[in-house]
């Protein structure tokens, strides 16, 4: 048993590891970036090494949301093709999505679900956005008076500690 939250960040290291794991008969999954879809050799080696699922932190299917939380390096417009590429190598994609980002609306959340179904994601998991104190977004929300709950024990799901511009706390929960 081993754990690595960023197993494929160093692609050359991961490829070497996967070559050594091939043939062991171990089935496994990992967290990784959607960017692995750009490396066909890595995907082939991961599958041969037993990788059958990747949990991918897409966060949002809205480019504006990605930029708002400083993850603009992600490209929402490439997600559909990336999901298909990864799954075309026999590796299921488990999408990790954050709800309650700045541009989210009830319609955009429904659109995210529709997108994931149409793109063929094997699974999806949804998390509530939390603007933690001390982070740039958390500090920004505090300055704007959008933090409505300062209880540190509520900075986890299912609590909504901020006022969203378009969704109520009940809608987010």
Regions found by a protein language model. Name each.
Residues 1-3:
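Active-site groove signature of glycoside hydrolases
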Residues 6-12, 16-173:
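A structural motif corresponding to the C-terminal lobe/cap of the Radical SAM core domain
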């Amino acid at each position: 048993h081993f754990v690595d939250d960023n197993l494929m960040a160093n692609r050359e290291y991961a490829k070497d590891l996967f070559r050594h794991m091939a043939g062991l008969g171990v089935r496994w999954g990992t967290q990784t970036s959607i960017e692995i879809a750009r490396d066909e050799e890595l995907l082939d080696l991961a599958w041969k090494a037993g990788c059958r699922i990747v949990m991918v932190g897409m966060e949002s299917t809205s480019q504006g949301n990605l930029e708002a939380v400083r993850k603009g390096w992600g490209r929402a417009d490439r997600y559909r093709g990336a999901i298909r590429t990864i799954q075309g190598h026999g590796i299921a994609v488990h999408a990790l999505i954050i709800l309650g980002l700045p541009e989210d609306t009830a319609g955009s959340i429904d659109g995210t679900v529709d997108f994931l179904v149409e793109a063929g994601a094997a699974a999806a998991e949804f998390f509530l956005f939390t603007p933690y104190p001390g982070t740039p977004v958390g500090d920004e929300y505090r300055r704007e008076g959008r933090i409505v709950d300062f209880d540190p024990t509520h900075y986890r799901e299912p609590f909504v500690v901020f006022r969203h511009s378009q969704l109520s706390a009940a809608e987010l929960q």
